[in-house]
Structures are given as C-alpha cells and as structure tokens.
A protein has these predicted regions:
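N-terminal amphipathic/basic leader segments beginning at the initiator methionine
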Residues: 1-55
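An N-terminal, well-structured beta->alpha segment
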Residues: 46-91
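Short glycine-rich or small-residue beta-strand-to-loop segments that form or flank ligand, phosphate
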Residues: 60-64, 96-107, 142-146
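Gly/Ser/Thr-rich loops at beta-strand to alpha-helix junctions
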Residues: 102-110, 149, 176-180
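Glycine-rich phosphate/diphosphate-binding loop of Rossmann-like nucleotide-binding domains
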Residues: 104-138, 142
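A structural-propensity feature for long, helix-poor, extended segments
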Residues: 133-163
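A structural signal for small-residue-enriched, beta-sheet-centric alpha/beta enzyme cores
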Residues: 143-144, 157, 173-281
Length: 281
C-alpha cells in the first residue's frame, strides 16, 4: 500500500506517485557502473510546486540490495556515487570543500552525517603545512554540526560561520532523509544542488542550508533511514509516526561509509578504494 500523502524527501519517489511528470519536470533513468540512477530536473516554479521540491537537479542512486564495505557491489556503488557527485558543476570546478555532516550521533537513524564524517579524508591543514606533499589532494575540511537540541545553534548558522572562516568553494551537506516507501530505506542515496532543510522530512523544519544563505554552492547528499508510517497505515495515529528497520544501526553504518567513500573518490581524484581503506582505518 502506498499513501501518496506520506512524507518523502526523495524527488524520484515524488515523481513516481504521479501518473506522469508535471510540466517543468524532466525525469528519466540511466545505468552507471551497473547501478540504476533516477534523474529528476525541476525547471519551473510550477514543477517545484507540483513535487514540493525546490528547482534544481536531483540524482538518486538506487541499489537493489543493502551495500556493505566487504560486499562485491561496494566498489561499483562507490564509483557511481563519485561520478554522480562530479556531474555537478559546482563540485567539478571547486578546489576547496567543506563537508557539513548533519545529524545526531546518539539517535541511530539520524547518525548518517556524523558517521560519514568518520570516513572523510580531511586535508586542509595538511595542504597548508605540507603543500608539496599534498598537492594532488583537494582541500577538504569537515564540520559536525550536531543538532539544535544539544548545541543551541542552528546547523545552518554553524555551517555559515565555518564558511566565513575557511572560505570553501563548495559545501557538501550530508544528512539522513525520510521516505514513504520502505524498500528505499538505506538503499537509495539522493544528491541534489538545491541545498537542504534539516528535519523537513519528519516535520521538524530547521533553517535552510542553501547557496543563498551560505554564499557558496551547496550539494546535498542524503539517504532515507525512516519511513512515514502513513505509507503503511491509513490510521490517524500513523500520521505522526515514523518507522525504521530493526537492523538500522548496521544499515546506517554501511550507508554512511558508502557516502564517505564516494565523496573521497570524487574530491581526491588519485585515490582508489584500497587507498581510502589505508588512510581511514
């Protein structure tokens, strides 16, 4: 059963609920390194209103199964994520990056950002002190924003302050998302150039993290970890509930690692999977 009113952060899912793509929305699929990718481009305000998403490009890596680091499909999925990230002009032309990892490490479904941060290869300080040794690396820094309830500071405000300090060419924001379809949980990874509104998928909207607010391009990467219970039940009680798989701790760790490796491969162009293993383990 699919409830068309169930919340979703995924543009591909929102398009799939409609009989056809509305005016101002282009949707198609492609294959990349053996992985299926859904592409949605919203080109008009009418299209944005129809989908409930800002205008921009949305790319969703759709994996048939859960992907672990030791799984055979991990290298292909990481390579696909790398190429999708590099397909955004803001990423390809930048030389310095701030990876903004959102979420609450103490709440498993919301721990995607903090866990992904553990796998990001940071180099900004090394390029400053050892420029010749790290000339082949991009300048990468990471900020773990925490959540408003434990920091007292909006994530957007934290990231904006960091942008003023380190002056990145591009911000890559990593966060957990919500879906209306159980099969998408931890099997889809969405990338978009529209920024992100933390908590929007679960009805807890926070300040928007966008180019307009930060002053530099923002690419958002997210994986759905919770599903709106309205997708499973028409009961009025389900409208305020979200559900998650029983093994969500394992799934979130695996999805976060895949995101981190995809970012590392995209930003540090000379590295391979084994190189990243050696640097972060």
């Amino acid at each position: 059963m699919q409830n068309k009113f169930a919340r979703t952060d995924l543009a591909a899912e929102a398009v799939g609920r409609l009989d056809k793509a509305p005016e101002g929305v282009c949707a198609d699929t492609l294959s990349l390194h053996g992985c299926e990718v859904s592409r949605v481009v919203i080109t008009s305000e009418a299209g944005a209103e129809a989908l409930g998403k800002p205008m921009g490009k949305y790319l969703t890596l759709e994996m048939a199964n859960y992907v672990t680091r030791r799984g055979q499909s991990f290298p292909d999925c990481a390579a696909a994520l790398r190429d999708l990230l590099k397909s955004f002009e803001a990423v390809e032309r930048a030389q310095s990056y701030l990876i903004a990892c959102l979420g609450n490490r103490a709440v498993t479904p919301d721990a995607v950002g903090p866990l992904a941060a553990d796998g990001i290869i940071v180099t900004r300080h090394l390029k400053s002190s050892l420029p010749q040794d790290f000339a082949a690396f991009s300048s990468v820094s990471v900020v773990r924003t925490g959540v408003l309830g434990t920091t007292g500071i909006e994530s957007a405000q934290t990231i904006r302050s960091m942008c003023e300090l380190v002056r990145p060419d591009c911000v890559i924001a990593v966060d957990a998302l919500a879906s209306g379809e159980m099969h998408r949980l931890c099997r889809n990874i969405q990338l978009c150039d529209t920024g992100i509104s933390p908590g929007s998928g679960v009805g807890n909207d926070r300040a928007e993290i966008s180019e307009a607010y930060l002053g530099c391009p923002v690419i958002a990467i997210g994986v759905p970890t919770v599903a709106d219970a309205a997708a499973l039940s028409d009961s009025a009680d389900a409208q305020s509930l979200f559900v998650t798989p029983r093994n969500i701790d394992e799934l979130v760790r695996s999805a976060s690692k895949l995101i981190a490796y995809g970012i590392d491969l995209a930003l540090h162009r000379g590295l391979g999977i084994e190189d990243i293993d050696a640097l972060i383990e």
